[in-house]
Structure formats: C-alpha cells, structure tokens
Amino acid sequence: MMIITTMQDAIGRTPVFKFTNKDYPIPLNSAIYAKLEHLNPGGSVKDRLGQYLIGEGFKTGKITSKTTIIEPTAGNTGIALALVAIKHHLKTIFVVPEKFSTEKQQIMRALGALVINTPTSEGISGAIKKSKELAESIPDSYLPLQFENPDNPAAYYHTLAPEIVQELGTNLTSFVAGIGSGGTFAGTARYLKERIPAIRLIGVEPEGSILNGGEPGPHEIEGIGVEFIPPFFENLDIDGFETISDEEGFSYTRKLAKKNGLLVGSSSGAAFVAALKEAQRLPEGSQVLTIFPDVADRYLSKGIYL
C-alpha cells in the first residue's frame, strides 16, 4: 500500500488496459493498449501537466508563495493546477468558454479556484485573450499558457512516456491519441519515436477541427479539437489524423462503460474508435497504444451515457 500526504503524490503510475478481439473487432493476435489516465487523482492526464507546470514555475522563479496562477482551459488543466496549487497555498483563476461542462467548472471551484466564463462563440481563443488581460492587471500573477508553453509537451515527455515504455516495451506499432493543446500527443510521441523509430503516430480530432484539412466548427466531444495548429509539432513526423464524429465518439464511450466498466470521457471514446480503425488497417499481431485522458463524471449532464 502506498501512503501519501498530498493528492499530488498520487499523480501518475496509472494502469494500462489491454483490449483484444474478445469484445471488439480487433485483428487476431493484435491488441489495443489504453493508458488509463482518467485514474489520476484529478481525473485526467492533465494532472501530470499541472504538477510539472507548477514545479517548473517554482524552479525558474516565475511562481512564489504569493503568486496567482491564471490559465485558459477547457477544464482539466484548471482542475490539475488547482489540485496541485492546494499544496502550495496558491490562488488560481481559470478562464473557461461557456460551452464546456458545468461539472468541470464546479470541480475547479470546489478546489478553491475562481472561474471566469467567456462566450462560446469566441472559443478557446477568447479565453486566451481574457487570460492575458487578467495577467496584465493582477500583480504577482503567472500565466503558464499551456497552448504555447514548451513545458506542456515536456511534462509528458518526462512522465507519461517513460511509464509507457517501462510497461509496454518497444514493440509498439502505433501511437494513436487525441489532440487538444497538443502537449500530451507531442511530448509522448516524440519520446516514443526516439525509442521506437518505426512507430506510427496518428492524431485524433473531432469533426469541426482543422488538423485533417477541415473547417473549424462546433462539436460536442470535449478536450480535443483545435482552432489553430499547436506549436509543438515542429519536426514531429505525424503519419496522419483520424477525424471522429460526435456520434462515433459517444457510441464507443458508452460501449467502454457497458462492456469494460471504463467510465471515461468522450475524448477517450474517440481515441478508442481511432485506435480500432488503426488496428484494422495494420497487419495481424500489431500493438496499438492510445490514451484515455479523462473520467466520465465531469460529463454526466451531457447525456452521453444514457
């Protein structure tokens, strides 16, 4: 039994779930592995980022005991930063577009954060603009700005990716994962590519995202999808992008709950659909890795699981 003194101590070391053709149309002798990041204490992969950003902030002097952390977020990064901030007695302010789930906003407030909403029509760009305005007006504030900060992919390069190699070795055929800020995908993909040069890298986005050549537009899958190209993809040889509809993502989110007891968010459902498609186009015996980024409880009001 691991004894901890703060919830921050429980971040990481998440299990890996193995899927075979028992429940899904996966080719014979192939497997899909999902890193269950929804089991982090804050309920998402972003716990790793929150821990890393605040740790690096203290190391570089950007954060002191009097700092107020300000960040634009769809929710999970805010939850992660608020969770880690508790240990250091830091104030947190998060700017969230109105469209994102009320549960995530309630969790941030429960962890002591101030949540400020921006119009849905302005997207995450509006939240970024508002966050920068707040940072200019509030003394002793720090704006990590995950969408531009190289510490974002670095967090996963140094934490998530080494765990994956330790657990699964270097025989993986493909890495398939959702792209939101781009940090989880870029940091993990770069580490894996350095150790498994032949690994395929497949990004996952919802309809209404631009990575696969589409036009920006509305979508109900939360946590992935971009309005602009993340800056972390330079010199990263991505093999392709899989665009998943809300209907596909929600359908597999429900299946993962009912068939496997995996209570995950819709970005996990989308990632699994994409991983399944990748496994089906690869030779038998292939090993596909994906990430389940967050937990179901923050989306219950969306009616996804009914």
UniProtKB/Swiss-Prot annotation:
SUPFAM superfamilies: Tryptophan synthase beta subunit-like PLP-dependent enzymes (SSF53686). Its EC number is 2.5.1.47. Pyridoxal 5'-phosphate binds at N76, G180, S181, G182, G183, T184, S267. It holds the Pfam family PALP. The modification N6-(pyridoxal phosphate)lysine is found at K46. It comes from the Bacteria. GO terms for biological process: cysteine biosynthetic process; cysteine biosynthetic process from serine. It catalyses: O-acetyl-L-serine + hydrogen sulfide = L-cysteine + acetate. PROSITE patterns: CYS_SYNTHASE. Keywords: Amino-acid biosynthesis, Cysteine biosynthesis, Pyridoxal phosphate, Transferase. Transmembrane segments: none annotated. GO terms for molecular function: cystathionine beta-synthase activity; cysteine synthase activity. Pathway: Amino-acid biosynthesis; L-cysteine biosynthesis; L-cysteine from L-serine: step 2/2. Homodimer. Belongs to the cysteine synthase/cystathionine beta-synthase family. This is Cysteine synthase. The gene is cysM.
